[in-house]
């Protein structure tokens, strides 16, 4: 592949709602620049970007895909991202590797849930953005309505730099508000014409908006604009670039992926107006002294691994954004996170599933490296003599948890390793072994996320697995008191067994576990046997009498007993303690406890009533509500874990996909009587 320096590179993430046409836009751009010989389609399985079995089956993007192409002497790296909330981790990772984003919006649907989410992610990174209004050929397409909706929602910095020629079935091209000419597609050829007379009013209105927006962020242009002086094409372009780079102006373009209209103009605009990585400085930590340091493109080599794919044949495939310096094949680099040296045997530029060898790559480029041994997503590669460590991306919380197990006996030994490799590829998945319940759990962003993970286990690693509802770690305790004797006596000639204890049971403090005390006087139970009594108490209380769950928050006092000089032993007193528990706990009003979790739910304020109502139906209680901004509310609530099964799905439904939450263990509380009866009956079957 041709060698490109930093000024000749453009990196853009294609983001937006599902089915807005992100993949189709990338496919059109690849075709227009000659990287492919046809426009692939996700719907018929011919896309070069959506090629994984799970994507072909569902006809949707699941994994972000790198699409590199050459255009007018520049290299454009597109990262096509998913548009469904379960895979937002892919979107965040892609944005960290790019200097700008193309937000794709449907001309028929306007702003949707993932449009808003992707915009906010890019805004958090202060990334320049352009908007591409797709599907201009569709029935009910309305460019001007969508532009107004965007301006009302995201601000007046959003401004068209082109407007459509025609709409719906008559859509045939775009009018460029900067060059003041039109680009029309006729018989698959892009032709350039002057603005037709019938469009001049629309063009004048739109150009006035563009001039006004550019002037607002450029003092020199503002002065000329207010004085009515003519503003040249060069001045408009310069002001536009300044506004875009500073994330003040967000240009709007349009087209149709179905008709192949607008993509030469899109790529020309990317080269002309979107930022180059050359001027971007990257901040990191010097691992030698933990001080903050800056790296510019001309400095020593450093790069950030933003994505990993585990290939069943090749192994680990790492996607690297080079932030400074130059990377050459057959060289060695240092991983400042694992503190290991890695060998770069080869570099590749990617066009979806196709790869092209690349001998050298410069700062700003995005490349693929295979067979790294000690490098995972989020790691920094650098020059060992001048080390740096970049902060890894923060992924969305894993809100949906299920238990997982091998569906076949033959896969039981393989599932652990397969899951580890899957997490290498997708950091938004988390695996946890609950030693108490015995469940192996897998957590993800949503239900679809875990369904896809199960399919990947089979397709990539040949492991058949199934999901099921994880068990809940209930507890048992007492609400009353009792005093009982536990006597173990076996004396039938010869050396016998004798242990006799009196135990008092009473409720303990919340969170205190099992508290054992002794108030023996007069040697009723010899000192050497008291540890055996305590051991018997603690071991027996691990299995409660109601449903077999561990007993907690209970005080046990050994206050009396008796012994035999010959027949008493540690085992006899341990057994006596167990007998006392089995007799005394039923008399002390035993109850079942369930775990409560604290939820912090972030939602648009509009949905607060529905979400609070939903919490109430789940036996939850609201602890606090706050509104950190005019359109965002945070609800803090405590809810029993038993009611949170599939809450991620419930919240998504209640908020149209706009809500998220985190949860952490809070405490245990008594289970209501009717529910307790059901749990006890189920466990005693």
Feature map (PLM): residue ranges:
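Structural and coupling elements of P-loop NTPases
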Residues: 1-685
């Amino acid at each position: 592949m041709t060698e490109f320096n930093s000024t000749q590179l453009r990196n853009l993430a294609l983001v937006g709602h599902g089915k807005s046409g992100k993949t189709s836009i990338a496919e059109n751009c690849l075709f227009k620049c000659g990287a492919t010989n046809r426009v692939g389609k996700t719907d018929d399985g011919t896309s070069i970007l959506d090629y994984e079995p799970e994507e072909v089956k569902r006809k949707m993007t699941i994994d972000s895909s790198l699409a590199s192409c050459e255009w007018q002497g520049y290299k454009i790296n597109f990262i096509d991202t998913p548009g469904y909330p379960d895979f937002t981790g892919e979107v965040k990772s892609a944005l960290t590797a790019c200097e700008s984003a193309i937000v794709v919006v449907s001309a028929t649907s306007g702003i949707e849930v993932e449009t808003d989410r992707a915009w906010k992610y890019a805004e958090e990174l202060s990334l320049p953005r352009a908007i591409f209004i797709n599907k201009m050929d569709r029935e009910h397409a309305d460019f001007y309505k969508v532009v107004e909706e965007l301006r009302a929602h995201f601000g007046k910095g959003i401004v068209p730099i082109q407007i459509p020629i025609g709409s719906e079935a008559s859509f045939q091209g775009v009018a460029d508000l900067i060059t003041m000419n039109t680009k029309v597609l006729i018989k698959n050829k892009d032709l350039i014409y002057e603005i037709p007379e019938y469009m001049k009013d629309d063009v004048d209105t739109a150009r006035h908006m563009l001039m006004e927006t550019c002037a607002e962020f450029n003092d020199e242009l503002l002065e000329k604009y207010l004085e009515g002086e003519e503003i040249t094409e060069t001045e408009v372009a310069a002001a536009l670039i300044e506004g875009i780079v500073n994330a003040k102006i967000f240009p709007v373009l349009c087209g149709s992926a179905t008709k192949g209209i607008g993509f030469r103009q899109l790529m020309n605009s990317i080269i002309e107006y979107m930022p180059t990585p050359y001027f971007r400085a990257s901040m990191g930590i010097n691992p030698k002294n933990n001080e903050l340091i800056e790296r510019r493109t001309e400095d020593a080599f450093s790069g950030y691994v933003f994505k990993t794919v585990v290939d069943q044949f090749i192994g680990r495939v790492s996607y690297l954004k080079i932030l400074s310096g130059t990377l050459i094949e057959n060289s060695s680099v240092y991983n400042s996170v694992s503190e290991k040296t890695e060998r770069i045997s080869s570099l590749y530029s990617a066009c979806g599933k196709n790869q092209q060898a690349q001998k050298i790559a410069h700062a700003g480029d995005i490349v693929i490296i295979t067979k790294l041994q000690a490098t995972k997503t989020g790691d920094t590669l650098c020059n060992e003599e001048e080390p740096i460590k970049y902060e890894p991306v923060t992924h969305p919380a894993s809100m949906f948890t299920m238990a997982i197990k091998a569906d076949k006996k033959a896969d039981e030994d393989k599932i652990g390793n397969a899951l580890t490799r899957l997490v290498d590829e997708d950091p938004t998945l988390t695996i946890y072994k609950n030693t108490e319940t015995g469940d192996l759990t897998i957590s993800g962003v949503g239900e679809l996320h875990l369904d896809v993970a199960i399919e990947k286990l089979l397709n990539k690693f040949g492991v058949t697995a199934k999901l099921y509802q994880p068990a809940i770690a209930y507890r048992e305790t007492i609400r009353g008191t009792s005093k009982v004797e536990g006597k173990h006596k076996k004396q039938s000639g010869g050396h016998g067994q004798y242990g006799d204890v009196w135990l008092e049971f009473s409720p303990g403090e919340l969170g205190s576990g099992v508290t054992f005390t002794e108030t023996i006087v007069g040697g009723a139970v010899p000192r050497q046997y008291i540890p055996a009594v305590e051991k018997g108490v603690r071991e027996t209380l691990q299995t409660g009498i109601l449903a077999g769950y561990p007993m907690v928050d209970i005080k046990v006092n050994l206050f009396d007993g008796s012994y035999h000089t010959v027949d008493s032993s540690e085992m006899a007193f341990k057994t006596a303690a167990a007998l006392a528990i089995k007799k005394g706990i039923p008399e002390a009003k035993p109850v079942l406890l369930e775990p409560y979790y604290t939820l912090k739910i972030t939602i648009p304020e509009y949905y607060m009533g529905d979400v609070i109502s939903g919490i109430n139906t789940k036996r939850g209680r609201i602890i606090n509500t706050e509104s950190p901004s005019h359109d965002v509310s945070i609800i803090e609530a405590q809810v029993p874990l038993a009611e949170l099964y599939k809450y991620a799905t419930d919240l998504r439904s209640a908020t149209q996909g706009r809500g998220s939450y985190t949860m952490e263990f809070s405490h245990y509380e008594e289970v209501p009587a009717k529910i307790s009866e059901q749990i006890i009956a189920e466990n005693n079957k």
